[in-house]
A protein has these predicted regions:
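Conserved hydrophobic/aromatic beta-strand scaffold that supports enzyme active sites
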Residues: 39-41, 52-56, 73, 97-99
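Short glycine/proline-enriched turns and hinge-like loops at secondary-structure junctions
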Residues: 49-50, 67-69, 110-113
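Glycine- and acidic-residue-biased ligand/ion/polar-headgroup-sensing regions
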Residues: 59-60, 65-87
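Short acidic-glycine-tyrosine-enriched beta hairpin
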Residues: 46, 73, 82-106, 110-111
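A short hydrophobic beta-strand segment most commonly corresponding to one strand
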Residues: 99, 112-129
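A short, N-terminal "cap"/entry segment at the start of jelly-roll beta-barrel domains
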Residues: 1-49, 133-138, 142-162
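Residue-level recognition of well-ordered beta-strand positions that form the cores
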Residues: 54-56, 80-82, 120
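A cross-kingdom feature marking solvent-exposed beta-strand/loop segments within repeated
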Residues: 55-57, 61-66, 89-92, 103-105
């Protein structure tokens, strides 16, 4: 460690997770609210509510309608997704990046084949039931809890968390 780094933060002991993680080593964690959906937890902030995960949807899985309370962006890593919003239907293939703005309601995300997405949630997402009432809310605190339960070290939001 450099002399300036030691003077800035003498307690800093690099662990190797400061800026990245090998997601191949992370376990898939089931999301009880959505049958056929599991995640790999990577990062979650208790301060901002943001969290980053890799989502796996089994073939044929449809995520319930949801309201993205703070927006999100996603990159389809593998598979094929059908995204429905009102009367519009989009087919997403690997390499497709998308953004959903805050307070947007999405009618459905359906995996035509087993699919994996890298998703950055800027805050909580509210999953809706068939009557379009909130059935469950997924937050950064849920991600932190799941990571702790499965022994996953999350990438810190700041170097102070290292």
């Amino acid at each position: 460690m450099s002399q300036s780094a030691e003077q800035f933060n003498p307690d800093f002991q690099p662990t190797g997770i400061e800026g990245g993680v090998d997601t191949n080593l992370l376990p898939w964690i089931a999301i009880e609210a959505v049958d056929g959906m599991s995640i790999k937890t990577m990062r979650a902030s208790g301060e901002t509510g943001a969290f980053s995960v890799i989502i796996k949807l089994d073939s044929g899985t449809t995520m319930p309608a949801a309201v993205y309370l703070s927006g999100m962006d996603m990159l389809l890593l593998s598979g094929r997704i059908r995204y429905t919003q009102g009367e519009q239907v989009s087919l997403l293939n690997p390499g497709t990046w998308g953004y959903i703005s805050a307070n947007s309601k999405v009618a459905g995300i359906h995996a035509e084949t087993e699919s994996e997405l890298l998703v950055n949630f800027y805050g909580a997402v509210a999953f809706l039931d068939r009557q379009h009432a909130v059935s469950t809310i997924l937050t950064s605190l849920d991600i932190m809890r799941k990571a702790l339960e499965h022994g996953v070290a999350l990438v810190p939001s700041t170097l102070a968390g290292c």
